[in-house]
């Protein structure tokens, strides 16, 4: 669903009717987080910034089975009990994430939130999408939690080490002793920890195979 389709979906009368119907459902969850409509999956980019807790998650608003390219949904809270539904934060609207804004994480640095996520691309052709046909790009987003200041690919698919499947996704970022690190899980072959500098974006690959 591209940006125009996303905006149209949010404004559709049937979307409002569906929200109202779901809100009255006897099986709707209230203690645990649940989207207003559609499909919800992995929590992403959990962080606290300027007194607000931000909870992002995999989200397909128009399909409860999740059989569409996922976005990042967004909820906020000041007490971790009451949550407010926010506008969709990230959508698959670029060439590097056109088949899904996959999972990632966030870290606060220099009064900004830095998000890292996997942009999923499935190329046309006779592929199994495990060993061929899939691109997984690591994307960096700078934001205040609501609007996007900058968004760019920092590790394109072709920059990953050779010898792994095309399933290279869901970067986890963290800080230790003044240095910032990223862990990217891989299918079958274990993990490749990548240390990085948010300022100059120089990457160092350390291969760890099981």
How would you label these PLM feature ranges?
Residues 1-210:
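Beta-rich carbohydrate-recognition and catalytic domains
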